[in-house]
Amino acid sequence: MPSDTRILIVDDHEDTLYALESALAPLGHRIGRATSGDEALKQVLRGGVGLLLLDVCMPGLGGLEVVRYMRRVEQTQHIPVILLTGFGVDHALATTAFRLGVADLLLKPVDPWSLRTKVRYLYDAHRRHLALEREVRRLRALAREHPGTPAHPASPVLPHPGAHVPTQRPQGAHAGELEKDRG
């Protein structure tokens, strides 16, 4: 993931933004902020966002609407999103959020240690996903440049996964001893 990629935190309350920034500061990642869904969507569409912490209820465009839009746009559909709510999690909210591909749904105030753990995991997973996509594009470009070369370099031949694997011991070995122990 490019070094200019950041975590974007979105909430309409300044004190919540400050608390989230403070909780995430030990991770050492760049952090951006937005105070509305509209502003968040603009930043996400400009690029450079590797993870989004997004409040569910905000004036104007709410968190779920932002996620719905992001999932329809190819460049933003794989950005991990953690939704935050201060009103509790009901079944309808959780169902909608997870159907949209939200990574997690957390209650405010958020436990800083738990938040850092989840953010570290999701941010790193997204960074690895992007690196794999870049590598696939690079390999496809190489394959187009050199169409006559084999796709895979010579490598040791491994047995087919369905091949018979011998058992560790002959059938029936120690069976008499097992029967004797049971009696």
Residue spans for each PLM region:
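Two-component/phosphorelay signaling modules centered on CheY-like receiver
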Residues: 2-6, 14-32
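Active-site residues of response regulator receiver
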Residues: 11, 55, 85
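Acidic catalytic/metal-coordinating carboxylates
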Residues: 12, 35-39, 62-68, 89
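Short amphipathic alpha-helix used as the core "switch/output" element in two-component signaling
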Residues: 42-43, 64-77
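Active-site beta3 strand of CheY-like receiver
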Residues: 48-54
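Alpha4 helix (beta4-alpha4-beta5 surface) of REC/receiver domains from two-component response regulators
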Residues: 65, 77, 88-104
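A Lys-centered signature of the CheY-like receiver
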Residues: 106-108
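C-terminal output helix
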Residues: 110-119, 123, 127
